């Protein structure tokens, strides 16, 4: 086992659930509007353009005001949000083909949801698909997902909603199109040229409250740079009606001030991914857990230790196994993270779709390797140095 890894729990949310009557007698708490949600985060988006500057704060806001063409659902299966069906080899909507230069490629058929419209009433069509592709593949725009757009060799448009992507390669994840971030051609095409200046001219920065930029259950109605973003229900949203009549995402960069605002009732919730670290959340829960609900959700990011395989002491796999059995990782998690940090038994997170549950697990069992070291040598025995000298005695650890 090469890596000793710990999943990095991303605290998704510290949610305010206490009624105003249980809070200290403060005007903000007493006057709380149940139709308004104020969320505290610790960073302000550098842009709201979906294809520039990948950052959590931007994704947090855009998730309320936009929808991707496809996403992974809770069962790690690709599903449509803005399309009517996924391309499939068995159904003929995905096909193997040769690229113009004779390499293996694929053709993928998609159809946009005919109900989908931008927030100003303009239908979302294949014109937006073509414009988005032009922006994404242009060498001077510098979009985040330029590799995806370059993989698309051409696009066949069949009508306002149906189109076919011709890809330069074949892949097992061909159904997904999550990084193809649709842009409103009727608004952004007018500011695209010259492409090198598009990042400075986009309406997502110059006029972010323009309803035609958004097509989610909410739309951005006000931006106070560096301070807050206000979202309100999109009256043209074709899906389930959103619950809150207004959501305010407020930026408070100092985490101590963020917590103080929550305690004062000035904000209702702290987003974990862009708010508090896990140790700060644990400290908050210890002091105020009776009045607030803290939700912990592990993320897919792993913090881990890589073993230096060139080190002669660690070059033998049996030594590494022995070391793993000698580390009480559960105790470490309990001491440092109150048990909120799940243990990793390999390089793949259990939440991942490709996780294999039957892979070997090296649980804490210091006696097991110690039985092999009947003749420890040196002052480090029976630790790693002695193990390296006597590992041959162990046929199986």
Task: Identify what each model region corresponds to.
Residues 10, 28-31, 146-197:
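Surface-exposed binding/hinge segments that line
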Residues 33-43, 84, 105-111, 129-132, ...:
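Short, well-ordered beta-strand elements
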Residues 40-100, 213-215:
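N-terminal lobe/hinge region of extracytoplasmic solute-binding protein
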Residues 71-77, 181-242, 246, 256, ...:
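Gly/Pro-rich hinge or "lid" segments in bacterial periplasmic/extracellular proteins
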Residues 85-142, 158, 164, 258-261, ...:
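Aromatic- and charge-enriched surface segment that lines or borders ligand/interaction sites
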Residues 136, 154-156, 221-235, 250-311, ...:
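Extracellular/periplasmic solute-recognition and catalytic clefts
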Residues 225, 353, 377-397:
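Ligand/substrate-recognition segments at binding pockets and active sites
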Residues 343-382:
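Structural transition elements
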């Amino acid at each position: 086992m090469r890596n000793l890894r710990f999943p990095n729990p991303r605290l998704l949310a510290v949610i305010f659930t206490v009624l105003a009557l249980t809070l200290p007698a403060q005007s903000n708490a007493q006057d709380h509007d149940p139709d308004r949600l104020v969320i505290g985060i610790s960073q302000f988006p550098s842009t709201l353009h979906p294809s520039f500057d990948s950052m959590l704060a931007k994704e947090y806001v855009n998730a309320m005001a936009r929808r991707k063409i496809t996403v992974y659902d809770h069962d790690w299966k690709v599903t449509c949000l803005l399309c009517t069906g996924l391309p499939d080899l068995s159904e003929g909507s995905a096909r193997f083909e040769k690229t113009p230069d004779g390499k293996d490629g694929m053709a993928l058929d998609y159809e946009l949801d005919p109900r989908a419209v931008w927030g100003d009433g303009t239908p979302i069509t294949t014109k937006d698909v073509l414009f988005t592709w032009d922006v994404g593949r242009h060498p001077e725009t510098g979009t985040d997902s330029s590799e995806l757009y370059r993989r698309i060799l051409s696009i066949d448009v069949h009508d306002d909603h149906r189109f076919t992507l011709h890809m330069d390669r074949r892949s097992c994840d061909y159904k997904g199109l999550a990084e193809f971030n649709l842009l409103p051609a009727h608004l952004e095409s007018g500011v695209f040229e010259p492409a090198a200046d598009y990042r400075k001219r986009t309406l997502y920065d110059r006029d972010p409250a323009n309803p035609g930029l958004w097509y989610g259950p909410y739309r951005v109605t006000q931006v106070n740079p560096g301070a807050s973003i206000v979202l309100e229900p999109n009256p043209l949203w074709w899906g389930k009606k959103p619950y809150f009549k207004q959501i305010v995402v407020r930026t408070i960069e100092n985490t101590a001030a963020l917590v103080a605002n929550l305690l004062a009732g000035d904000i209702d919730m702290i987003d974990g991914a862009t708010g508090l670290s896990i140790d700060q959340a644990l400290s908050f829960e210890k002091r105020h857990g009776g009045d607030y609900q803290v939700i912990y959700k592990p993320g897919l990011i792993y913090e881990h230790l890589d073993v230096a395989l060139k080190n002669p002491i660690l070059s033998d796999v049996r030594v590494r196994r022995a070391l793993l059995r000698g580390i009480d990782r559960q105790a470490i998690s309990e001491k440092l993270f109150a048990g909120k940090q799940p243990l990793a038994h390999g390089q793949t997170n259990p939440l991942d779709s490709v996780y294999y549950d039957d892979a070997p697990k090296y649980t804490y069992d210091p006696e097991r390797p110690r039985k092999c070291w009947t003749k420890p040598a040196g002052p480090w025995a029976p630790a790693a140095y002695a193990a390296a000298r006597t590992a041959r005695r162990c046929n199986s650890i």
